[in-house]
Amino acid sequence: MQHRTRDLLIRQRTQSINAFRAHLAELGIVAAQGDAGVTELLAIVADEQDTRLPIDARASVIVLAAQLGALRTLIGSIEKRIKTQHRSNEVSQRVETIPGIGIIGATAIVATAADPTVFRSGRDFAAWIGLVPRQDSTGGKQKLGPISKQGDRYLRRIFVVGAIAVLRRAQENPGKYPWLTQLLARRPFKVVAVALDPDYARLAYA
């Protein structure tokens, strides 16, 4: 439940940041992408001596700034509880060792699939999440189609983001991930990421 709540709050925070940036951009006030840019814009709004922001406009964006602050606090509180639970859970600690998963991903996987015995195999677990190709039968032959995208969307996103993170590391440090580097040399980035997802799901199941 708390993972879903965190996910909702993060989406709300993203919407608030976009609105906050858009309001200020209309006045010619822009900053770099990422948290550093948002922090810079918040400082401008908080500084009543900054003449770039008219008084009336400041009153409006202060509301958005307050909303951002509240969302950050709520998200931080949830993440603190998640990390506390993770420290006392050996299973999620093992899952965290899977490259690209992290604490949030590990605890979400353990919380959502608390009883792995309901799955006959790692492939069944991957299929439950929606990470295995659809199988179509044509003329008596089995053909693998695209990823089904059925199942648990939240967990599927965790594995996809994790795979992308690992591939980016491989691009930055090819010598550390030789087999991924070879795959990336032969296949498009997204194709390799999708191919990794079921493998990571099987590792989590194990």
Name each region found by the language model.
Residues 1-206:
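A detector of single, family-specific signature residues
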